[in-house]
Regions:
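Catalytic nucleophile-His microenvironment captured as a short glycine-rich beta-strand/loop
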Residues: 104-131
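Predominantly the structural core of cysteine protease catalytic domains
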Residues: 45-95, 159-174
Length: 291
């Protein structure tokens, strides 16, 4: 939404694919019986910066690093300054604090991004790509979501991106090569063996309420979409990796249904199939990096 307002015609599903957030898996909360697992191996805020750079954009960004003192007046002034040039992307936000979403109580600790288009003395005005346009929220009420205290996989709090200016126009081949390198790097830096361990835990212990809320309302359906978008992006460059991603999208869709039915035996089997395909994809990503 923000880039479109600046006059850049880039489809949301294309940008989502380039964020590369549907690969691998990460344990975000350790627990022998009920670990909390996200189906990605990257940080979403860093992914936004990567996408902008890969596509040839110059931009301004701000975030408050760990241990830095919080100065809300400074943060507000920074946002106001960026808004003078156009909409600003904010996030990661904790969806549990976005009260305009009727499902927000099921989404604490889940990251999200929005496009802010105005700020006055009391209110923030934003478009949420989850289907909530023209939302008006008191600035003070928005701060807990923006602080994202429950989201560990981020560079910092109060992150924002704005003042977008495309200074280069890399061709499709250059974009593919850059994203391919990022995929390999994330696999090398990410956690390994998460999915087989998770499959075993699900088979033995099932899912607790926290896991069910995450998976039923968010993670499986999002993983399916992310894998499908990446499959489409890869189709003209690497047919094998594209097919694996298409198959993974189908498996994540089936996992969503098994999760809703609370059929944990079937869900465990699906997670093992996902693990096998993701490992194949990982191997191909590392091989492509070395070519």
């Amino acid at each position: 939404m923000a880039l479109e307002a600046y006059g850049y015609d880039l489809r949301p599903e294309y940008l989502e694919a380039l964020m590369l957030m549907g690969n691998g898996a990460s344990i975000v909360k350790e627990d022998e019986e009920h670990p909390l697992v996200f189906f990605d191996n990257g940080m979403p805020d860093l992914s936004i910066s990567h996408v902008l750079e890969v596509l040839g954009f110059d931009y301004e960004e701000y975030y408050l690093g760990e241990g830095q003192a919080v100065d809300l007046d400074l943060i507000r002034r920074k946002l106001k300054a960026l808004l003078a040039n156009g909409p600003v992307v904010l996030g990661p936000l904790d969806m549990g604090h976005l009260t305009y979403n009727p499902n927000h109580t099921h989404l604490y600790g889940v990251d999200h991004f929005v496009s802010v288009y105005d700020l006055d003395d009391d209110y923030l005005y934003l478009h949420d790509p989850a289907g909530f346009a023209c939302m008006k929220i008191q600035f003070e009420d928005f701060l807990p979501a923006w602080q994202a205290q429950a989201i560990d996989y981020k560079r910092g709090a109060y992150s924002m991106w704005g003042n977008f200016n495309r200074v280069a126009s890399p061709d499709a081949s250059a974009i593919y090569l850059a994203t391919s390198q990022i995929m390999a790097q994330r696999y090398l830096q990410g956690q390994e063996g998460v999915l087989p361990l998770y499959a075993a835990a699900v088979a033995k212990y099932g899912l607790n309420d926290e896991q069910k809320q995450l998976h039923q309302y968010f993670s499986f359906k999002l993983a399916a979409v992310r894998n499908l978008y990446l499959s489409r992006f890869l189709a003209e460059h690497d047919s094998l990796r594209s097919k694996i991603k298409e198959d993974l999208a189908s498996l994540f869709g089936q996992a969503h249904l098994s999760c809703l039915k609370e059929d944990y035996e079937d869900l465990s089997h699906l997670l093992l199939e996902i693990a096998e395909l993701d490992e194949q994809f990982r191997t191909l990503c590392l091989e492509a990096r070395d070519c």
